[in-house]
């Protein structure tokens, strides 16, 4: 058991080390450094502590050597520990490709061939992906349970019987009723979703426009975004009001408790929709179209079609969270651009790695609601493995964004550090398998994406 845990730590550390090298190469972090050191393995001339580019080049090669030693140690421990065949295969592939990667890096450093850096970076991502797969499969074998009994077709629990006890709540003053009603309408808008989705849109705008971004565009886009999120949340409350009564987590929602009548909630949702689309239209027509698409997708396609009918609801539903990236980019640029699409892909891939943690924590609640969430239908072991899959894919997509944009060291460092925190929280989730561990990984996922989006905004606007 101790040897297995040692191997898990080495494998996770190796994956993070490889990712550090990938992000450094994907962003502009090494652009000047490559020109400052065109020999290999050492740089010509004495080390100049005032030459930042030269120090970065030296640092990159030293880190590559250290990660190489880590790869060797991890491979030796892993192959000796008796891990399963596919884990061994993934380790061997990554370990064999690593010296090839070093050799290719040497050629890149000493050659002017423009196609080689791309191949060097792609190979690095492949090595990282190989180690992530090895980690996912090893954790599954180490911590998985054969005693799980997934429910293929979860049936909603009966709606709780009404309480006929007379209401003895003291009469409220007009001010108390007003505050309570306003608070209930605010809850309909799902305000907890707003900060992160607005950050997604802000990152899209920053990437598209850089320092030419105008305050008017920001205010109109984020204002429309807040209102569209509120509209989507309100319609979701209306459509799931009966199911909300069956779930502990949602049984106190305003419509489920009849605090707000359905008719009033629908009117409120429509008002928010029209207001958001009007603000989006002030930016441009395509932003308004994307905003309407986001509202319809979340309110109708996700809530009525995907969520109650397919185990892939979380994956496919990630499109709703990805749309703000395109909205932000189009608001600043006027058309859809490839970096904006890649940012949307990052959010799409991040969503399962993020939300599956919540699905684990509220597994019984989702089963009571009749939702075929991954932990309910496929089991907790499979769900934890998929979290690692999607986390690895998210990090690779983040590397691709670095290639397509002039993002630099701040983005690279943030993505690596917070990605490592997120990954380790997921490793602990596999080991502990508790509700607290699921919430820890959930919050780590929020911290990762929030920090990366802030880094994008700062990098694009200020650095």
UniProtKB/Swiss-Prot annotation:
An example Gene Ontology biological process: heme O biosynthetic process
Region (Disordered): 144-170
Pfam families membership: UbiA
One of the record's GO molecular function terms: protoheme IX farnesyltransferase activity
HAMAP family according to UniProt: CyoE_CtaB
Function: Converts heme B (protoheme IX) to heme O by substitution of the vinyl group on carbon 2 of heme B porphyrin ring with a hydroxyethyl farnesyl side group.
Entry protein name: Protoheme IX farnesyltransferase
Organism ancestry: Archaea, Methanobacteriati, Methanobacteriota, Stenosarchaea group, Halobacteria
């Amino acid at each position: 058991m101790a040897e297995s845990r040692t191997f898990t730590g080495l494998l996770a550390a190796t994956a993070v080390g490889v990712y550090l090298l990938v992000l450094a190469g994907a962003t502009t972090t090494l652009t000047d450094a490559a020109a400052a050191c065109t020999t290999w393995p050492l740089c010509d001339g004495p080390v100049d502590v005032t030459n930042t580019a030269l120090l970065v080049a030296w640092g990159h090669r030293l880190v590559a050597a250290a990660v190489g030693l880590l790869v060797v140690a991890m491979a030796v421990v892993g192959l000796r520990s008796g891990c399963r065949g596919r884990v061994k295969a993934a380790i061997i592939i990554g370990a064999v490709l690593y010296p090839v990667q070093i050799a290719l890096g040497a050629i890149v450093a000493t050659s002017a061939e423009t196609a080689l850096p791309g191949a060097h970076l792609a190979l690095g991502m492949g090595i990282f992906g190989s180690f992530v797969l090895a980690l996912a499969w090893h954790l599954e074998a180490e911590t998985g349970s054969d005693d799980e009994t997934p429910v293929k077709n979860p049936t909603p629990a009966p709606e709780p019987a009404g309480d006929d006890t007379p209401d003895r709540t003291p009469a409220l003053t007009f001010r108390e009723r007003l505050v309570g009603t306003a608070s209930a309408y605010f809850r309909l808008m799902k305000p907890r979703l707003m900060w992160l989705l607005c950050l997604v849109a802000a990152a899209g705008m920053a990437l598209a426009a850089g320092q030419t971004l105008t305050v008017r565009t920001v205010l109109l886009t984020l204002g429309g975004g807040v209102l569209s999120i509120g509209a989507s949340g309100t319609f979701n409350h209306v459509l799931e009001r009966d199911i909300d009564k069956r779930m502990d987590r949602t049984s106190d929602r305003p419509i489920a408790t009849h605090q707000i009548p359905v008719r009033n909630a629908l009117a409120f949702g429509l008002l928010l929709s029209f207001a958001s689309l009007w603000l989006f239209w002030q930016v441009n027509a395509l932003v308004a179209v994307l905003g309407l698409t986001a509202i319809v997708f979340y309110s109708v396609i996700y809530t009525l079609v995907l969520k109650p009918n397919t185990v892939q609801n979380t994956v496919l539903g990630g499109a709703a969270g990805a749309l703000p990236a395109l909205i932000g980019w189009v608001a600043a640029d006027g058309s859809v651009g490839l970096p904006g699409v890649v940012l949307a892909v990052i959010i799409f891939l991040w969503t399962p790695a993020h939300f599956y943690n919540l699905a684990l924590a509220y597994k019984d609640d989702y089963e009571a609601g009749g939702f075929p969430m991954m932990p309910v239908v496929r089991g907790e072991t499979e769900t934890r493995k998929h979290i690692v899959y999607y986390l690895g894919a998210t990090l690779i997509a983040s590397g691709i964004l670095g290639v397509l944009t002039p993002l630099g060291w701040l983005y690279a460092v943030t993505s690596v550090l917070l990605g490592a925190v997120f990954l380790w929280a997921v490793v602990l989730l596999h080991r502990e398998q508790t509700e607290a561990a699921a919430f820890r990984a959930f919050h780590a996922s929020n911290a990762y994406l929030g920090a990366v989006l802030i880094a994008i905004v700062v990098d694009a606007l200020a650095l």
